[in-house]
Every structure is written in structure tokens, then in C-alpha cells.
Swiss-Prot record:
Keyword terms, alphabetized: Cell membrane, Endonuclease, Hydrolase, Membrane, Nuclease, RNA-binding, Transmembrane, Transmembrane helix
One Gene Ontology term of the molecular function aspect: RNA endonuclease activity
Domain HD: residue ranges: 353-446
Source species taxonomy: Bacteria, Bacillati, Bacillota, Bacilli, Lactobacillales
GO cellular component: plasma membrane
Signal sequence bounds: none
GO annotation terms (biological process): mRNA catabolic process
Protein name: Ribonuclease Y
Keyword Ubl conjugation set for record: no
Gene3D superfamilies for the chain: Hypothetical protein af1432 (1.10.3210.10), K Homology domain, type 1 (3.30.1370.10)
UniProt organism field: Streptococcus pneumoniae serotype 2 (strain D39 / NCTC 7466)
């Protein structure tokens, strides 16, 4: 029983152990499955998180790459733009410097070529000068011998004509001289042209020597300021257009204006030289209008010169009116105002005559007021005292005589007429006002720096030079150029033939030598131009 009980107990224990083992095994298996499930879930979640993280990382990387590429492109574009701008600036600077260097090199080359050419010419002239002088001397002897032969022929013809025709000596001489002049006109003209051609090459050197000597002796600027006008050019290429083909433009300009055009190596500058201020002002206005317009040819030059002559005429009237109002004489005759306006372009010993007249008028008015005289009449007389100088180069007589005639013509008071007549002491002063004006004239002229004796003498010499040329038959007009070293004469082609041109130049030269005192040489140029104009309709 006890064994049975023990066996049962043992069996129960075994059963309990088996059941416990089974129970424990079941629990362990359940726990393991749960753990495995949790592990699978954890792994799945980890896999999901890793995938999401990888995707987010890929997105961030891609976005970062895009931003990096965009920034890189912007930086590259900015760098390229800056490089392009810098390269353009450098290229422009280099281009400007190259252009400037090219211009400088071109000028230097031209000057070197010109100097070489002048040096060659001077060398050639020096080598042939003695030979030409000897040739001229021989020809002069031949001409003398020929003249003797001609005189002998004339004597023979005189005797023959008197014997055959019973003519008087005077009649025979006239016939012979007429025949001789007609037969020898061509020969004389040819001889003169040959002689001029032989000494032409010497003239350039002599003119340069004279110019150098004058420059060394005189260093003042006054004459240049009084006789020169400067016109600025947009560029040096305009110099060639001003000269024109074969010099046509510059010759037309100089012949129409009577002003010398100086074109030298000075960059972008043309100088207009002439002693007549009105001509020089017309030339300056014409040149500036030609440069602005751009059309430079003889017809346009002629058109603008005529237009500017009319413009100057209007300015002259305005100057006269303004001066009359300034001195308190607004009731002056309009023609007298215009004549007085011309004095704006007239100088006396370097002093502007219109300003001098205004100055005399004001001084005379002040002195008349102090003395109890008619101040308005004194100003009027002082203003008109030099009116004759406005046209003394056009009308015969002194400026005093011309002024008296003008005052009488326009019915000025007798006091004014006597003041004009007596202000240089030519006649006796008949009023206190005449004495006052003479004193005011002396005060204005004696003011330090007011006048220059040399300029007046210079201008008078140029006027005399033109008067000599204009005195010959067939001469239309003449212009003194190159500071009086050249006289250019325009002749009527209907009265002066080609064969007579050289003879006219020779006669003018002889008369200048006999009547004028002048330094150096004077070139006489006679121009005969035949122009035909028609209109197509």
C-alpha cells in the first residue's frame, strides 16, 4: 500500500513534472513567438524608418545638388560678365591708345617727309641758283641789245615813213609804236614769264628769310590779335576739304573774301589773316558756316559769302544804333547810324574808332556840363567827329573833308560841322563845343595803350597797295594778302586778254616799286577768270 502510494506519488510527481514541462514549454514557445513577432515588427519598422530616412536624405542631397548647381551657374555668369566688361574696357583703352599713337606716328611721318622734301628742294635750289642768276644776267644783256636793235629799226621806219608819206615825226612815231606794241606783245609777255619762272624758286627762300628776320625782331602779339582770326576744326581731315581739289575751294574763298587762309601743322586750327576787319569777320562767319554745314565747294562758298555780307550789313546798323543810344542821340539820322556802325570794324593806330568816338562823346558831354554848355550837342559832335573814317578808303579826300560833307548832307547843326572840320586844327574852331571835342579827342587818343603807330602805318600801306592795283584799266578788284607781301588782282576778262595779263602784272610791279616803301618783296598775282552761266528750264 505504501509502495502503491509511493508509486502513485511518484507517478503524480512525474505527471506533474510532465505537465509542468509541457506548460513551461508552451509558455516558452508562446514567449518566443511573441518575441519573434516583436522582432519582426521592430525590423519592419526599422526598415521603414531606414527607407524613409534614405528617401529624405536623397531628397536633401538632390535639393542640395540643385542649389549647388544654381549657385555655381550664377557665380559663373557673374564672373563671365565681369570678365567681359573688363575685357571691353581694356580693349577700348588699348584701341584709343593705338589710335592716338597712330595719329602721332602719322603726323611725325608727314613732318619728316615734308622736311626731307624741303631739304632736297633747298639743296637743289642752292646748286642751281648761281647758274640761273648768270642766265638772267645774260638774258638781260640780250634784251638790252634787242632794245637797241628795235630802236634802230624804229628810227629807220620813221625816216622811211617821213620820206614816203610826208608824215610828221609825231604821227610816224605813233604809227610805229602801235605796230611795235602789237607785234611784240606776245614776245614781251613770253620773256616776262620766263624771267618770273627763273626767279620763282628763289622767292620761297627769300620769303622765309624775311619772315624769320621779322619774327626775330618783333615778338609782340598785338598785330596778330588785330589782323588774325582763328577757326577751330572738328578734325584735321577738314583741312583737305577746305583746300579742295587742286586748291579750288581755298582759291575761291580767298578771292571772294580778300582774306588769306593759313593752313599749317597746327592741329584742328585754320587761321584767317587780313587787315580789313569787315572782310575778316565775313571770312570767319563763312568758314564756320561751311564747317557746320559740311558742304564745301565754290558755289556754296560764294552763296555763304554773299549771305554773310548781308548779315554784316545788318550788324553794322545795329552797332551804330546801339552806340547812338549809348551817347544819348537816338534822333540821329538812320543813315548816319549805319555809317557810324562801320567804325566798329575800323581802327586808327590800333584803337577801335567806334569805341573812340563814344569815349570822345562822353568826355565832351562831361566837360560841356562843367562849363555850362549844351552837353547833348557836345556829345553829338564828339560822336560824329571821326565819321569820315568810315568811308575814307572808298571816297576821295581826307576823313575830315568826308565827315563835313556827310554832316552837311544829313543837315547836322553848324556847330557839329565846324567841330568835324576843326578837330585836327585844319580850320579855326567857331564854338566852345568844337574846342571841347578837340580836347576830348586828344584825351582819348593819348590814353596809355589806346593807340599803336605801327598798325596804322601797316594798314595804310596795304590800302595804298590796293589803290595802285585798282588804278589800272580792266582791274575789277584787288586784295592785299600775306601781310602786304602779295597783291592779288582780279581782272575783267572782256577787257584784259591772256597775253596782257603778264604785262599788267609787270606794270603793277613797276608802279609799286616807284611809289611805295616796303620791306622784302611783294608778289603780284593777276587772275583772269572767264565764267559762263546758263540755266536749264
Amino acid at each position: 500500500m505504501e509502495i502503491m502510494s509511493l508509486a502513485i506519488a511518484v507517478f503524480a510527481v512525474i505527471i506533474g513534472l510532465v505537465i509542468g514541462y509541457v506548460s513551461i514549454s508552451a509558455k516558452m514557445k508562446s514567449s518566443q513567438e511573441a518575441a519573434e513577432l516583436m522582432l519582426l515588427n521592430a525590423e519592419q519598422e526599422a526598415t521603414n524608418l531606414r527607407g524613409q530616412a534614405e528617401r529624405e536624405a536623397d531628397l536633401l542631397v538632390n535639393e542640395a545638388k540643385r542649389e549647388s548647381k544654381s549657385l555655381k551657374k550664377e557665380a559663373l555668369l557673374e564672373a563671365k560678365e565681369e570678365a567681359r566688361k573688363y575685357r571691353e574696357e581694356v580693349d577700348a583703352e588699348f584701341k584709343s591708345e593705338r589710335q592716338e599713337l597712330k595719329q602721332i606716328e602719322s603726323r611725325l611721318t608727314e613732318r619728316a617727309t615734308s622736311l626731307d622734301r624741303k631739304d632736297d628742294n633747298l639743296t637743289s635750289k642752292e646748286q642751281t641758283l648761281e647758274q640761273k642768276e648768270q642766265s638772267i644776267s645774260d638774258r638781260a644783256k640780250n634784251l638790252d641789245a634787242r632794245e637797241e636793235q628795235l630802236e634802230e629799226v624804229e628810227r629807220q621806219k620813221e625816216a622811211e615813213l617821213e620820206r614816203i608819206g610826208a608824215l610828221s615825226q609825231a604821227e610816224a612815231r605813233d604809227i610805229i609804236l602801235a605796230q611795235t606794241e602789237e607785234n611784240l606783245t606776245r614776245e614781251i609777255a613770253s620773256r616776262i614769264r620766263e624771267a618770273e619762272q627763273e626767279v620763282k624758286e628763289r622767292s620761297d627762300k627769300m620769303a622765309k628769310d624775311i619772315l624769320v628776320q621779322a619774327m626775330q625782331r618783333i615778338a609782340g602779339e598785338y598785330v596778330a590779335e588785330s589782323t588774325n582770326s582763328t577757326v577751330h576744326l572738328p578734325d584735321d581731315t577738314m583741312k583737305g576739304r577746305i583746300i579742295g581739289r587742286e586748291g579750288r575751294n581755298i582759291r575761291t574763298f580767298e578771292s571772294l573774301t580778300g582774306v588769306d587762309v593759313i593752313i599749317d601743322d597746327t592741329p584742328e586750327v585754320v587761321t584767317l589773316s587780313g587787315f580789313d576787319p569787315i572782310r575778316r569777320e565775313i571770312a570767319r562767319m563763312t568758314m564756320e558756316m561751311l564747317l557746320k554745314d559740311g558742304r564745301i565747294h565754290p558755289a556754296r562758298i560764294e552763296e555763304l559769302v554773299e549771305k554773310n555780307r548781308q548779315e554784316i550789313d545788318n550788324k553794322i546798323r545795329e552797332y551804330g544804333e546801339a552806340a547812338a543810344y549809348e551817347i544819348g542821340a537816338p534822333n540821329l539820322h538812320p543813315d548816319l547810324m549805319k555809317i557810324m556802325g562801320r567804325l566798329q570794324f575800323r581802327t586808327s593806330y590800333g584803337q577801335n574808332v567806334l569805341r573812340h568816338s563814344i569815349e570822345v562823346a562822353k568826355l565832351a558831354g562831361i566837360m560841356a556840363s562843367e562849363l555850362g554848355e549844351n552837353a547833348a550837342l557836345a556829345r553829338r559832335a564828339g560822336f560824329l567827329h571821326d565819321i569820315g573814317k568810315a568811308i575814307d578808303h572808298e571816297v576821295e579826300g581826307s576823313h575830315v573833308e568826308i565827315g563835313m560833307e556827310l554832316a552837311r548832307k544829313y543837315k547836322e547843326p553848324p556847330v557839329v560841322v565846324n567841330t568835324i572840320a576843326s578837330h585836327h586844327g585844319d580850320v579855326e574852331a567857331e564854338s566852345v563845343i568844337a574846342v571841347i571835342v578837340a580836347a576830348a579827342d586828344a584825351l582819348s587818343a593819348a590814353r596809355p595803350g589806346a593807340r599803336s603807330e605801327s598798325l596804322e602805318s601797316y594798314i595804310k600801306r596795304l590800302h595804298d597797295l590796293e589803290e595802285i592795283a585798282n588804278g589800272f584799266e580792266g582791274v575789277q578788284t584787288s586784295f592785299a594778302l600775306q601781310a602786304g607781301r602779295e597783291i592779288r588782282i582780279m581782272v575783267n576778262p572782256g577787257k584784259i586778254k591772256d597775253d596782257k595779263v603778264t604785262i599788267l602784272a609787270h606794270k603793277v610791279r613797276k608802279k609799286i616799286e616807284n611809289n611805295l616803301d616796303y620791306p622784302g618783296n611783294i608778289k603780284v598775282t593777276v587772275i583772269r577768270e572767264l565764267r559762263a552761266v546758263d540755266y536749264a528750264k
